[in-house]
Structure formats: C-alpha cells, structure tokens
Amino acid sequence: MHLMYTLGPDGKRVYTLNKTTSDGEITKSAHPARFSPDDKYSRQRVTLKKRFGLLPTQ
C-alpha cells in the first residue's frame, strides 16, 4: 500500500492508504515522481518554476 492524500475542506492534505475517499473522490499519491538522469524537460520545468515563483521542490 502506498501513502495517498486528498485535500480537506481547509485546503490541507489529509493522508490515507485508500485509493478513494468515502465520497468516491480519487486520492493522489503522496510520493514524489521517480528521478531520471535522462530527463528531457528539466530545463523547461526549472524555467517555469522561476517564472511563477515556486520552490524548486514543488
């Protein structure tokens, strides 16, 4: 089982091990994507994060 999350009514993450909530909403994975040294789009991602003022890890 993997750790999953959904956003609560206050906007904070609510963690669960289920794939769906009791309301039938699909949860999202709480784990980051795998790292690949052959990442073709890292330059574009870094540029977009700088443009919109996001942290590099978001």
UniProtKB/Swiss-Prot annotation:
* Pfam families in UniProt: Nop10p (PF04135)
Gene3D superfamilies on file: 4.10.80.300
Provide the protein's localization: Nucleus, Nucleolus
Q: Which GO terms describe its cellular component?
A: box H/ACA snoRNP complex
| Keywords tagged on the record | Nucleus, Ribonucleoprotein, Ribosome biogenesis, rRNA processing
What Gene Ontology molecular function terms does this protein carry? Answer: snoRNA binding; telomerase RNA binding
InterPro entries per record: H/ACA_rnp_Nop10, H/ACA_rnp_Nop10_sf
Methyltransferase: is it a keyword of this entry?
no
Its main subcellular localisation, reduced to a broad class, is nucleus
Q: Give the record's GO biological process terms.
A: positive regulation of telomerase RNA localization to Cajal body; snoRNA guided rRNA pseudouridine synthesis; snRNA pseudouridine synthesis
Main role?
Non-catalytic component of the H/ACA small nucleolar ribonucleoprotein (H/ACA snoRNP), which catalyzes pseudouridylation of rRNA and is required for ribosome biogenesis. This involves the isomerization of uridine such that the ribose is subsequently attached to C5, instead of the normal N1. Pseudouridine ('psi') residues may serve to stabilize the conformation of rRNAs. The H/ACA snoRNP complex also mediates pseudouridylation of other types of RNAs. The H/ACA snoRNP complex mediates pseudouridylation at position 93 in U2 snRNA.
Query: How is this protein organized at the quaternary level?
Result: Component of the small nucleolar ribonucleoprotein particles containing H/ACA-type snoRNAs (H/ACA snoRNPs).
Q: Which PANTHER family match?
A: H_ACA RIBONUCLEOPROTEIN COMPLEX SUBUNIT 3, RIBOSOME BIOGENESIS PROTEIN NOP10
Q: Which family does it belong to?
A: Belongs to the NOP10 family.
State the name under which the record lists this protein. Answer: H/ACA ribonucleoprotein complex subunit NOP10
> What lineage does UniProt assign to this protein's organism?
Eukaryota, Fungi, Dikarya, Ascomycota, Saccharomycotina
